């Protein structure tokens, strides 16, 4: 299954330290292998998104979260990454709207609005 990193996520990924990058890579590899069937603890549903299919990728041993959604072609689109340590609730409040907008933009540009 295809996993696509938006340019913003790619920049964030390459700025991670080696250990964080390895954890994120492992989670992305699992998502690529398992696709939509991958569940907790690696993937969980996100509440408060305007997209019912918004999820979070949860790399092992970290407080890193990557918000993503499956598009109509069943590709996992990684929309936003960050570390929510010490900022558990506010991280979602701040970042879900950004991920929603990026998902909307992806759907409009790649799929004619979804």
UniProtKB/Swiss-Prot annotation:
InterPro entries: HigB-like
Keywords for the protein's UniProt record, in alphabetical order: Toxin-antitoxin system
Top-level taxon of origin: Bacteria
Any Pfam family matching the protein: Gp49
Task performed by this protein: Putative toxic component of a type II toxin-antitoxin (TA) system. Its cognate antitoxin would be HigA3. Not toxic upon expression in M.smegmatis.
Family: Belongs to the mycobacterial HigB family.
Protein name: Putative toxin HigB3
Source species: Mycobacterium tuberculosis (strain ATCC 25618 / H37Rv)
């Amino acid at each position: 299954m295809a996993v696509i990193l938006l340019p913003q996520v790619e920049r964030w990924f390459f700025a991670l330290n080696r250990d964080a990058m390895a954890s994120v890579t492992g989670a992305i590899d699992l998502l690529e292998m398992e696709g939509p069937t991958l569940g907790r603890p690696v993937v969980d549903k996100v509440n408060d998104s305007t997209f019912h299919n918004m999820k979070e990728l949860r790399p092992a041993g970290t407080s890193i979260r990557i918000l993503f959604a499956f598009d109509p072609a069943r590709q996992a689109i990684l929309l936003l990454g960050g570390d929510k340590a010490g900022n558990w609730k506010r991280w979602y409040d701040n970042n879900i709207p950004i991920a929603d907008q990026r998902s909307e933009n992806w759907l409009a540009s790649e799929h004619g609005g979804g």
